[in-house]
Amino acid sequence: SGGADGAPPHLELGLTGYREYVGTHLIDASERRALEDDGERDHGERGAHMANALGCEAVLVTSDGHAVLLRRSGEVATHGGLYNGPSGHPEPSRAVVEGDDKETRAVEAAARVRNELYASVLMETHEEVGVPLEKLKAPTLLGVMADPTGKPDLLFLVRTELDAAAVRECYAAGAEEG
């Protein structure tokens, strides 16, 4: 939540993974409806039994005002062949906190989750486009969006000090996932 009243956004997150996401979203329509109906009946929320892994996506803007789009492989499980910004998923393992004091752990975990959300969009941009991390500026959260299946993504604005030609060179030199 959060919004027009000026309150900061509030997200409630649980743990899930890509395999669970595929298992609850890329299934027969009747099976999906049954899961959604169960969620409505059991929890008053159609998406309660869906593994909606939180994604992150960047609108990468170059110093000369160009936005960078990537075409998704036809081999991926979802949205193959479509264009989007550098995107991926935060790594929950980077937000794990251990210790005995529950209150201290909760505060530290919240900070780690927040840091991971922002760090993951920079790492995905670096890995997919090849722009060095030191050439990327701090991300700005633009909002939250959902794809047609209900999977949520955080959308960030990420600026680079590189111009479009330099970004093309980074990409051509071999992004880590390219």
Protein language model regions, located:
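N-terminal leader/linker segments that precede catalytic domains of diphosphate-processing enzymes
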Residues: 1-123, 131-178
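Juxtacatalytic substrate-recognition/specificity segment
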Residues: 126
